[in-house]
Amino acid sequence: MLQVNVELKERRYPITIGAGLLGDPNSYSSLKAGDKVMIVSNPTVAAHYLATVTNTLNGLGCSVDSVLIPDGEKYKTLDSLNMIFTALLEKNHNRDTTLIALGGGVIGDVAGYAAASYQRGIRFIQIPTTLLAQVDSSVGGKTAVNHPLGKNMIGAFYQPISVIIDTNTLQTLPKREVSAGLAEVIKYGAIFDIHFFEWLESNIHHLVALKQNELEYCIQRCCQLKADVVARDETEKGDRALLNLGHTFGHAIEAHLGYGNWLHGEAVSVGMLEAAELSRILGDLSAQDVSRLERLLAQAVLPTISPDGMEPSEYLPYMWRDKKVLGGQLRLVLLKSLGKAYVTAQASEQQVLSAIERFTQREFHE
């Protein structure tokens, strides 16, 4: 078992990583006999893990209820949020309740925002069951739901009291979801740590195959990198924005296709390449490093060209709605080199379009 601590100005919380944690009472040290718990999950995850978590908490003397919301990014909505509120109210939960998010990034985001909002805030625990959620979305307190006009437009910064990462949950994860998580893993190396990027180049096949030792190291390293930046910049006023490499481009893909048609990690994969190519156009990143990133993403079984039929100009309306737009300027996370990212507003719209064009479906432009 491994542990990473997220050190905030006012408090800290643990991220625990290991196999078999869901059924281990020691994983729930922040709960005690008599505590009220509401578990938020979806039918797919609940079929595998809800009984284990419920039985373990009952064994601790907790009173446990659960609510299931539909599965998928297209259900990361105010309607799903309202389902959670209704369940909490119908079961007479109050400010003493602890809400548990049992699932992937959608569950974590919606349940986290419910915890931030219900009776002005209740405690919550993240139990991420996808690789993407384990290395990224469950850590750091970003919670949100989508709006038809943009992703994550309604939300709050709200930190969990703990994160429990049971690597056994990855064994039931579809291979496509594993690859989507690896996009965020590769992102950490690209923005913060060239040595980790090089380790990934040597070990990506072990991660695709879900080898336990490599997985645990990878998850721990990603969580540590995320914890470090969250400790410096909890509410994304500075360095934390670097975690959005590829996301401005990627969110445009997701919104254009309709949420859920491409997985978030798949869209971020292409978005990172478009950001890398823009970095090359601006004179920062070498063509060789763009190719290294492209090769690593391909080895992770991720898309490396934009969706069929999506023209470069179709990105722009979504990109201009991005939360990082300030003072009428499109601010993008780019790469000085592999392992070093920065934020700039210096790229022209034509340069952005040229970068997107480089990774647009070949047959569409022939």
Swiss-Prot record:
Gene that produces this protein: aroB
Pathways per UniProt: Metabolic intermediate biosynthesis; chorismate biosynthesis; chorismate from D-erythrose 4-phosphate and phosphoenolpyruvate: step 2/7
Ligand binding (NAD(+)): 71-76, 105-109, 129-130, 142, 151, 169-172
Record GO biological process: amino acid biosynthetic process; aromatic amino acid family biosynthetic process; chorismate biosynthetic process
InterPro entries (alphabetical): Dehydroquinate_synthase (IPR050071), DHQ_synth_AroB (IPR016037), DHQ_synth_fam (IPR030963), DHQS/DOIS_N (IPR030960), DHQS_C (IPR056179)
Family, similarity comment: Belongs to the sugar phosphate cyclases superfamily. Dehydroquinate synthase family.
Cofactor(s) needed for function: Co(2+); Zn(2+); NAD(+)
PANTHER family reported in the protein's UniProt record: 3-DEHYDROQUINATE SYNTHASE, 3-DEHYDROQUINATE SYNTHASE, CHLOROPLASTIC
Function, in words: Catalyzes the conversion of 3-deoxy-D-arabino-heptulosonate 7-phosphate (DAHP) to dehydroquinate (DHQ).
Cofactor binding, note field: Binds 1 divalent metal cation per subunit. Can use either Co(2+) or Zn(2+).
Residue ranges of the TM segments: none
EC code: 4.2.3.4
Species assigned in the record: Actinobacillus pleuropneumoniae serotype 5b (strain L20)
Residues reported to bind Zn(2+): E184, H247, H264
GO molecular function per UniProt: 3-dehydroquinate synthase activity; metal ion binding; nucleotide binding
Gene Ontology CC, one term: cytoplasm
Reaction catalyzed: 7-phospho-2-dehydro-3-deoxy-D-arabino-heptonate = 3-dehydroquinate + phosphate
Main EC class the enzyme belongs to: lyase
The entry's keywords: Amino-acid biosynthesis, Aromatic amino acid biosynthesis, Cobalt, Cytoplasm, Lyase, Metal-binding, NAD, Nucleotide-binding, Zinc
Cellular localization per UniProt: Cytoplasm
Protein name: 3-dehydroquinate synthase
